[in-house]
């Protein structure tokens, strides 16, 4: 289950007892999350580094990623453990080296993990899939005009 604070994603619940839960923070080196650049379909994998920033690996090196791009969680099948659309962070550095199979960047999270107070655990989501909000709607089919020719006899002049 996703763990969030006011500004975005904090981590994921790893285990639960009757009184508490153990959360794997985004900063943990074993943390992995599928993300996308907000407003696009560009996807990548975000990894914890053990520090204050995160490592982003884009799956397609030909895609553009820019300083200031915002990332959101891509989500998991069945929304567990990650729900889609949760804000993750902002790109702060991009490696524009050519000839690589993937593109790398650094990301600063929206949530400061060193100063957390109350967090929330997302137990379920709505039936609406927020991932669809980034996909443009399918174009409506253009109606085919129907032309009907009616021959009207003209009055004859006598």
Regions found by a protein language model. Give the residues of each.
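Extracytoplasmic/periplasmic terminal helices and flexible tails
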Residues: 1-158
